[in-house]
Swiss-Prot record:
CXXCXGXG motif repeats lie at residues 152-159, 169-176, 191-198, 205-212. This is Chaperone protein DnaJ. It is found in: Cytoplasm. Zn(2+) 1 binds at residues 152, 155, 205, 208. Keywords: Chaperone, Cytoplasm, DNA replication, Metal-binding, Repeat, Stress response, Zinc, Zinc-finger. Transmembrane segments: none annotated. It comes from Rickettsia bellii (strain RML369-C). Belongs to the DnaJ family. Its cofactor is Zn(2+).
């Protein structure tokens, strides 16, 4: 392998522009044919190598390309193109041919591209659907209505009139872009003739104007599985907008919102509710019928001495879960109700109860201890 350009100039690969310039001027002066020692037959050759090296390394973009592909890429291309040919390029060929891959990386594929397809995938759609808690528990099928782009039923998505076909764009060769020389680089531009599609529709469909789709109001039945939670997103593949000129459809995403319930508050798979009971049931215990989310009622046992704010649990009576037979629990928060309007008999009974309570020791500190515990 011959010397690379850094070796020719006698600098490291990390040399800055000032170092390059200094090294170049020193060597150019030394090996200039007018200054070279008499009889030095290699001076002219060396001088050309120095100029070629500096020509590449002083340019940031050329230097980046040289660092990436190496010295051999230049030598090989020069051998193929012939010295001094190809329009005066210093390496015997258009430098853009040497670095086609380099341009592809930085320009989005400007080197050797294959013809592009005129098909474009349709956009995804989002639909917000509100359901009640019972529907979330049982699952439900809902009919929704929305507007979107649909596949043209006249041209079947091709964009051409019936019997017509598309042709490859002769301006870009089906690539969808043309290349324009701007100094050292070849710059890609969207083809003005096919607008980047790569195909030309000579006789566009009159219904969809060559797009292969048109706008329409749609009705769709969507299935909501049992156990969905608030904020659940359900994907319906292929139910989004139709693609352009036969491209694949997008997807439809249904976002679920659950209405607040009159009785229950949702906490994951558990349900919370307030349970009002009489002070008699709280003191003596008993059973009360409570409604459940699946419909109907179940009996809940109230232990004797239940206090206001106590929490009673009904296992397996909460929300269902998606793809599971396990349910959450229902938690009833006790609210002891004290009657405001007493009958004569009720008052008499309570007075008797108070009289019995008065016979208990009132100076044992228990009342004050309870008060203290409430404030501690």
């Amino acid at each position: 392998m011959s010397q690379d350009y850094y070796q020719i100039l006698g600098v490291s690969k990390t040399a800055n522009s000032a170092d390059l310039k200094k090294a170049y001027h020193k060597l150019a002066k030394q090996y200039h044919p007018d200054n070279a020692a008499s009889g030095d037959t290699n001076a002219e050759k060396k001088f050309k190598e120095i100029n070629a090296a500096y020509e590449v390394l002083k340019d940031e973009q050329k230097r980046a390309a040289y660092d990436r592909f190496g010295h051999d890429a230049f030598q090989n291309q020069q051998a193929r193109g012939g010295a001094g040919s190809q329009g005066g390029h210093p390496f015997g060929a258009d430098i853009n041919d040497i670095f086609g891959d380099f341009f592809s990386d930085f320009m989005g594929g400007g080197g050797r591209r294959k013809p592009t397809s005129s098909k474009v995938r349709g956009s995804d759609l989002k639909y917000n659907l509100t359901i009640n808690l019972e529907e979330a528990f049982h699952g439900v099928e809902k009919n929704i209505s929305f507007s979107s782009e649909v596949k043209c039923d006249t041209c079947h998505g091709s964009g051409s009139e019936k019997g017509e076909t598309t042709t490859t764009c002769d301006a870009c060769g089906g690539v969808g872009a043309t290349r324009v020389q701007q100094g050292f680089f070849m710059i890609e531009q969207t083809c003005h003739k096919c607008q980047g599609n790569g195909q030309i529709i000579k006789n566009p469909c009159k219904k969809c104007h060559g797009l292969g789709r048109y706008h329409k109001q749609r009705n769709l039945s969507v299935n909501i599985p049992a156990g969905v939670e608030n904020g659940t997103r359900i994907r319906h593949p292929g139910e989004g907008e139709a693609g352009i000129r036969g491209g694949n459809n997008g997807d439809l995403y249904v976002d679920i919102a659950i209405k607040p319930h009159d009785i229950y508050k949702v906490d994951g798979a558990n349900l919370h509710c307030k349970l009002p009971i009489s002070f008699v049931n709280a003191a003596l215990g008993g059973e009360v019928a409570v409604p459940v989310i699946e419909g109907g009622k179940v009996n809940l046992t109230i232990p004797a001495g239940t206090q206001n704010g106590d929490q009673l649990r009904l296992c397996g009576k909460g929300m269902s879960k998606i793809r599971s037979t396990i349910r959450g629990d229902m938690l009833a928060h006790v609210h002891v109700e004290v009657p405001k309007n007493l009958s004569k008999r009720q008052r008499e009974l309570l007075e008797e109860l108070r009289g019995e309570s008065a016979n208990e020791k009132e100076n044992d500190g228990s009342f004050f201890n309870k008060m203290k515990s409430l404030w501690s």
